[in-house]
Amino acid sequence: MKTVFFHGLGQTAQDWKEVVQQLSISDVDCPELFSLTEDEISYSQILGDLEQRYSEVKEPLRICGLSLGALLAIDFAIRHEEKVDSLVLIGAQYKVPSLLIDFQNLIFRCMPNKVYESMGLSKSSTIKLAHSMRSLDFTLQLNNIRCPVTILCGKKDTANLKASKRLKELLPQATLHIVPNAGHELNKYAPNTIAEILNQ
């Protein structure tokens, strides 16, 4: 079974490196989400590219996603239940808070262009991508997810902690792990915790 990692906004596939190094499995895929497309970047474009990438898979995937990656994992599982064996959702939202996106975009606008170079996205593309996620709301479709789900959230990730707890309530088959002394980017703060769960 292939394990797939979807990184977050402001990250690259390299941010999964410490997790992957600790895995007892070798069939792993970490796509660079922002270089999948040559078109103008948007949430729906990235999702479409992922659907195409995994259109020929012969057995269900185990998908691990962080933040934006968790949204994509949820969406993919809703649309392609037969292609998903299980989900690991990190710092996840299932209904994107538009105020949070607007605040995030305000911060993005103030950041210097050189900050974006390592992300593989320009400032304007980052802002457009975040804006394209404003209306995402999977609340009514979550009951289509029947596979096992593990939810992880850093205790210091105050922006996503409440949503993670609520997501656990909406997905009765899910387990929730609050990671002490950790923030939002658990693939950086607690890669060993993610690896332990994936190695079970």
Predicted feature locations:
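Serine-hydrolase catalytic-loop signature spanning alpha/beta hydrolases and amidase-signature enzymes
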Residues: 10-18
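Active-site loop/oxyanion-hole signature of alpha/beta-hydrolase fold enzymes
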Residues: 17-21, 29-61
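Flexible "cap/lid" loop of the alpha/beta hydrolase fold
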Residues: 43, 78-79, 86-113
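Gly/Ala-rich beta-loop-alpha elbow adjacent to hydrolase catalytic centers
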Residues: 65-73
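Hydrophobic, aromatic-rich cap/lid helix
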Residues: 114-138, 156
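Short beta-strand/loop motif that positions the catalytic acidic residue
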Residues: 144-145, 151-153
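Conserved alpha/beta-hydrolase "acid-adjacent" motif
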Residues: 158-163
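Catalytic histidine-centered segment of alpha/beta-hydrolase-like enzymes
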Residues: 182-192
